[in-house]
């Protein structure tokens, strides 16, 4: 007897949210675990009036034999609109003008029921933050609880059985998503930073919320209610919690960055003549190479620690390169899309055909300058330190990145050092609260309109504003869709249901652009629903994006390869 199924769900592969019963019929245990996990993480720290917290958005859970990866979107709150009966808000003028105008600083929604908490949302303000959680039970002796036994101030309740047991025991092999194309994910994420410095608790949010952007609300209430989002032009923050304790090592990449990016030696622009500029640049490169190697090889006892330090430094340099330019020249993350953002270590950063030529030029320049500036003996002495650790490639990648930044006359944007320090404080806060090592990285999304999930969540914020109609929202999205048509997107269909614009009778409005066939089995379609609570009730949003076979278009949420 043939099984009846939803045609859309058959085409969605992993994205089966439209037909959950079909999935649970075959994977009942996995569905139970997934719902249990999502309920647990959603109850850990909900936002309240006096404490910051987070709400879970779209959630994707991947099970592997010895670990489980949880990827979910955390919607950010855009800049507040003006209050009724109040003067209009002060225009934000932060110290981060050099970072470019990407968008307002966002924060998470609070569960408070006041009018201020339900302020309407403006179009481009709604962003996304991608959070990934890794649960690993490889080492039983290192298994720990996510939260300490002391529950003061966490604000979660005991509705999930996972709280009472070690997570590793409840996350054993389910095999729900076991597929050959996911086999590389473990290797891609194996580089994760496992070291962290212990800091004392400090005021974390002053940097993320300047005084001018706090309107006239009490500062303490705003800071306690919100979780900091990423500064402008660093659109997204990736957090990874490693739920197994590791030995920590002390390495400060901020010091290294300050040394080789800041003008330690005389800048070429301050010297007269080409020869003087060349000598100044040579001295600076030589000084930076020696300083970098000394910092990354001192107090080393094993290869693993050396690799951690260099990898940590490379990530910070990537962050700097990201912040210093509005147009990136290399791919910083292999998973192109809005769901997975895991930059690999030095090798993964340069696995881009577009960057191969530049990479070879830098390597050649590195060899010439090292031999000519520092002398054969000095170069060999530095290289031997890494040869002893059997990892000369790490040295090459680190120095190569330094030369790239120096030769392009990069400057640290004003306030960037402050940003790095605040990121470290944020990691420290999370480390102290969860007793787990935490990784925070800043990445960007190149094309949001290739995936249905970010569009659906972005639209779900906008109907809160009574003045925004469905037509205006749809027309704004349609303007950007042609930009991704060349990448394989054929069309988009959007439907909104509910009391739109406060109408007394609920209705459904739909719009489409391009080809969006939902009745063809072999059509590649990405689908995502979303809900939004307004003062007039709950409204729903559905988004379909169709992809071309000839251009090999594909949904971002289903992309796991470079």
Swiss-Prot record:
InterPro entries named in the record? KH_sf_prok-type (IPR009019), Ribosomal_S3_C_sf (IPR036419), Ribosomal_uS3_C (IPR001351), Ribosomal_uS3_CS (IPR018280), Ribosomal_uS3m_plant (IPR044954)
Stored Pfam families: Ribosomal_S3_C
Q: Which GO terms describe its cellular component?
A: mitochondrion; ribonucleoprotein complex; ribosome
Annotated keywords: Mitochondrion, Ribonucleoprotein, Ribosomal protein
Q: Could you state a single Gene Ontology molecular function term?
A: RNA binding
Does this entry carry the keyword rRNA processing? no
Q: Name one GO biological process term.
A: translation
Query: Where does it reside?
Result: Mitochondrion
- Record keyword Ribonucleoprotein present: yes
Q: Which PANTHER family match?
A: RIBOSOMAL PROTEIN S3, MITOCHONDRIAL (PTHR35928), SMALL RIBOSOMAL SUBUNIT PROTEIN US3M (PTHR35928:SF2)
Q: Family, per the entry? A: Belongs to the universal ribosomal protein uS3 family.
In Swiss-Prot or TrEMBL terms, this protein is called Small ribosomal subunit protein uS3m
């Amino acid at each position: 007897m043939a099984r009846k199924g939803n045609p859309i769900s058959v085409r969605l592969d992993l994205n089966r949210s439209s037909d959950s019963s079909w999935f649970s019929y075959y994977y009942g245990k996995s569905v139970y675990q997934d719902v249990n996990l999502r309920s647990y993480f959603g109850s850990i720290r909900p936002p309240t009036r006096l404490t910051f917290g987070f709400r879970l958005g779209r959630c994707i859970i991947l099970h592997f034999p010895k670990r489980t990866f949880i990827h979910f979107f955390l919607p950010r709150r855009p800049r507040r609109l003006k209050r009724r009966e109040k003067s209009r808000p002060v225009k934000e003028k932060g110290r981060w003008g050099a970072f470019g105008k990407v968008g307002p600083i966002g924060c998470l929604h609070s569960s408070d029921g006041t009018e201020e908490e339900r302020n309407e949302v403006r179009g481009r303000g709604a962003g996304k933050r991608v959070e990934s959680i890794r649960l690993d039970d490889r080492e039983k002796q290192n298994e720990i609880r996510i939260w300490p036994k002391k529950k003061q101030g966490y604000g979660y309740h005991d509705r999930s059985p996972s709280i009472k047991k070690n997570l590793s025991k409840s996350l054993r092999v389910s095999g729900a998503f076991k597929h050959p194309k996911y086999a590389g994910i473990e290797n891609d994420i194996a580089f994760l930073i496992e070291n962290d410095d212990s800091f004392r608790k400090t005021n974390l949010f002053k940097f993320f919320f300047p005084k001018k952007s706090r309107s006239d609300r009490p500062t303490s209430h705003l800071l306690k209610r919100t979780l900091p989002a990423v500064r402008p032009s660093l659109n997204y923050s990736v957090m990874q919690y490693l739920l197994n304790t590791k030995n920590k090592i002390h390495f400060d990449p901020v010091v290294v960055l300050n040394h080789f990016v800041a003008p330690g030696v005389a800048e070429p622009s301050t010297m007269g003549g080409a020869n003087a500029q060349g000598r100044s640049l040579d001295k600076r490169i030589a000084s930076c190479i020696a300083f970098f190697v000394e910092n990354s090889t001192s107090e080393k006892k094993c290869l693993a620690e050396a690799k951690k330090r260099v990898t940590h430094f490379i990530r910070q340099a990537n962050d700097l390169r990201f912040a210093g330019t509005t147009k990136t020249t290399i791919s910083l993350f292999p998973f192109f899309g809005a769901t997975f953002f895991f930059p690999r270590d030095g090798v993964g950063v340069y696995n881009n055909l577009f960057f191969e030529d530049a990479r070879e030029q830098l390597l050649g320049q590195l060899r010439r300058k090292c031999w000519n500036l520092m002398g054969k003996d000095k170069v060999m002495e530095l290289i031997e330190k890494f040869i002893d650790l059997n990892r000369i490639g790490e040295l090459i990648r680190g120095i190569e990145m330094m030369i790239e930044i120096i030769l392009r006359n990069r400057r640290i944007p004003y306030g960037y050092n402050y940003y790095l320090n605040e990121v470290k404080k944020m990691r420290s806060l999370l480390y102290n609260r969860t007793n787990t090592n935490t990784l925070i990285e800043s990445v960007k999304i190149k094309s949001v309109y290739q995936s249905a999930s970010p569009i659906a969540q972005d639209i779900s914020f906008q109907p809160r504003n009574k003045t925004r109609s469905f037509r205006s929202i749809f027309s704004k999205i349609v303007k950007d869709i042609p930009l991704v048509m060349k990448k394989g997107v054929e069309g988009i269909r959007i439907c909104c249901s509910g009391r739109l614009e406060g109408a007394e009778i609920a209705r459904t409005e739909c719009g489409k652009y391009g080809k969006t066939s939902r009745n063809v089995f072999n059509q590649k379609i990405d689908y995502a629903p979303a809900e939004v609570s307004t003062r007039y009730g709950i409204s729903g949003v559905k988004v379909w994006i169709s992809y071309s076979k000839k251009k090999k278009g594909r949904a971002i949420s289903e992309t796991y390869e470079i």
